[in-house]
Amino acid sequence: MRLDLIAALSLVVFFASPASADTNAKLLLQNSPLAGFRYYEGKQLWSEMKVGDTLQLVREPDNSHDPKAVRIDWQGHKLGYVPRTDNKALARFMDQGSKAEARITRLKKSRNPWQRMEFEVYLDIGQPIQK
């Protein structure tokens, strides 16, 4: 899935924390499979991860394979990357200082490493919303 800036801004806005009186609106930027699952720590951590877990997004502008690389970590452990075909808009937002959040949306036992984990990325659009 390739998202350009306009497509990214036309996606769904949701509330980050329904229990909170003041929340910031979030923009769903993308839903992607995890790239590189078989090369990093995902296999060893599989039994500990759960759908809904928070993921850390780490921008790697000096990555020799892809200058738009965005690494995906879980509790300080490297799991892989946002796929190269999906990382342009996210890298641009992160380079401009936008706050991005990610969470696991799917965990599936599969021989195909591209089907093992999916995640969503949200941008904090910085607007507090009163409930």
Residue ranges and their predicted role:
Residues 2-131:
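Conserved active-site motif detector
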